[in-house]
Amino acid sequence: MQKRGLLASSIVYVVVLLFVTSVAFENPAFSQVQEKGPHIDQARFIHRTDDNLALEEVKSGSLDMYFFPIPHEAANDARNDPRLKVYDTTAGSLGFFVNPAPAADPNILNPFQFKEVRYALNYLIDRDFVVNEILKGYGSPLIDPFGIYSPEYLNIIETVESFGFRYNPSLASSMISDAMIAAGATNSGGRWVFNGNTVTINLFMRQDDPKKVSMGELVASELEKIGFSIQRDYGDLNKANTVVYGSDPKNLQWQIYTEEFAGSRAFVKYNPTIPAQMYAPWLSRMPGSQNPTYWNYQNATLDEITQKIAFFNFTSEQERNQLVSDAVKMGIQESVRIFVAQKTDPFVASANVRGLVNDFGAGITSKYSLLNVRSGGDGNLSLDIGVKQIHQGSWNTIGGLQDLYSASIHSMVADTATFRHPYTGEVIPFRSPWTDITTEGPVDKIDLPSDVIKWNQTLQQWVQAGEGSTAISKVTFTPLYSKWHHGIQMNVSDMMYADYFTYEWGTNTGPGDRTVDAEYTPAVSEALKLSKGSRYVAPDRIESYIDIWHYDEKEIAGSGAFFATEPWEVLAASERIVTDGRLAYSRSEAQAKGIEWYDPIVREHAEMVKGELQKMKNEQFVPPALRGIITIEEAVKRYDASISWIENHGHAIIGNGAFYLDNFNVAGGTITINAFRDFSYPFEVGHWSQYETPQLAEISSVNVPRIVTISQPTPITVNVEVSGRPSSNATVNYFVSNKDGIVVARGEAQPESPGQFNIDLTSEMAAKLSPGPNQIKIFATSNEALRPDISSSTILAAPGALGSSQGTNNKHQVSGDISAVNTEQ
């Protein structure tokens, strides 16, 4: 991943969404002197396909933890086993990805090309059955991309509740029949026929996960009942990358896919990318992937709305929240991606392991966990971690790292400009801490200094900002350089090359432009419209000028600050290979051209990088973007270091993180990362310990009248604890719904005393209640950890003067018996 920051990073979740082998870097004794990096010296990721076997290995001590959910039916026993500790994660989801393309063959009918048929699936899918039977109660029904535990959920709850989806196969069948008949299909003998051909649906199921197979069989059974023939196909994520995400949708190699997201790579308070990733074509995550040679799903309205969210094109918090709500509403109506269940996934680690950070987005697979983990009592400085898959997609930083397995490991070896607080989701400084944020937004502008520069692809040189150039905001940051893992010190040349790459590959100058990728370029081009240039004040001080404003200034910093995550020479070598047509950065580009997806962790591709580096050395090559910045001698030194690294490690993953990737053993199914102990690394051992324990809120009681008189004001009291003590360091929101599920009142409870919050249900609010049962949902969130505790109570409303004896709520946990996005899993 290159120029990080929301400007590139608001698309990097989804789009671009990174040693010399001297003994000093690998010597544990040396590491103890330097006290830099993680507590542990080594982590070994070991392929385990059987979840039950992996659980037994954690029990026995053969594995220290398992970076994949254990079977739900085994979770209760695991909680009672003193050898284990269970960590619950609630960020993941299950659903269906639906192909809306008309068939290339006019005699073949794809029912899902009709929005009405796709939408009807929401009534054909029994979400409660999925939660209760397939997930064994470890989850909750879901129809939106955020889920009830996301900070964004409070912005969309009224929209979500308004759909009122319930399992209703008769209604679904009627809706589908109307659409099929209108399209010219007939139902003969209980089977749908079009132009003499049986209407067949190609259903792709992930066979590497039983719950996805069960979900697939569930929807297959329902579709067969209403007259469709089902062609079942099975495979893992590797196959899905080809069949589902990499093929031309009009060829109908797939029509429904059982899709799972493991959650986001980090917890995000104001998630700018999820609406676009899940619903909008422009981000290259919808059918067709924006590949110009394919049929592509198109929705200009969703593109416009989600781009405003992604690039902060709003003037207030209220406007942004409305945009998010509008995007979710239209996405649900379009039903190209249908969400079914939010998962509560139990992960396990040995009870001897200390310091894991259960990030609200990534769970214990977060970057923070291995930065802070330690093994208690036995002096063990090496951990063995079971993983479900060892290699399911490309590790290239431009169009790869899209699956849980590669992303979680890669995050350990490459640091980014900023990161996210694991419990509040706020932007925090990482390798490019900001020293100043200046903004005149949302309306006014800053005049740019004359020495602000940006890369001009046509001229192939850096150009200065023109006279009269302006920007909404300026972020000043100071990169924390260290040595790359191959031993060469990072410097401003790496920053400038990352800056260059975003412009070069984010701009399409037309036919003949070889620095274009079908997925990366269209997404990045939208971000580039907001980049006004960079000012390299000093090697370690950079000013970034952007047309971005946010009501939370930390989000501006996260947008403007960037950091290089791989050495410029490795990126330059890959460019030469890709522009030569030998490999492609993105999955769909590779498939369309009939070439391989560039994957620097694979030895064969690393050898290609090595060969290109040797050519660059022989040519005395200096990239145009770095001419006048580095000397030939400096370039050659870089080439030699990267060549040596590839020769010694068999891959081209060269990062700057707290760990380096030592080796990828394909036959043995292992990836080994070792601590990077060089004194240049900026963070000492124990730096991240503050994130070990979240301060969670809990609703201890809700006092609500059993019967409420319509149109009469009603007081409600909510008692809240934070970390086990009554506290007002929390936010309490409430939503009242009538008998039809429509939200008729909402608000924020006010603190009366430590731990006591008052809700004043006014006469105007009470007038909107339905006679009979209504519902009040209460969300209590600690201000230090934004995972809500949720209470739901029934309010019986009646006209006239009736008794109002007090009762307490029937508090329930939305996730079944467990108390309380995204990478593909």
Residue ranges and their predicted role:
Residues 113-221, 225, 326, 372-374, ...:
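Append "and occasionally in soluble cytosolic enzymes with long acidic Gly/Pro-rich linkers
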Residues 32-76, 229-231, 492, 684-712, ...:
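Ligand-site clamp/hinge motif
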Residues 36-37, 47, 70-177, 193-201, ...:
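Local pocket/hinge segments that shape ligand/substrate recognition
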Residues 55-70, 75, 79-84, 225-284, ...:
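Periplasmic binding protein-like
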Residues 47, 119, 131, 231-240, ...:
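Extracytoplasmic/peripheral linker and loop segments enriched in polar/acidic and small residues
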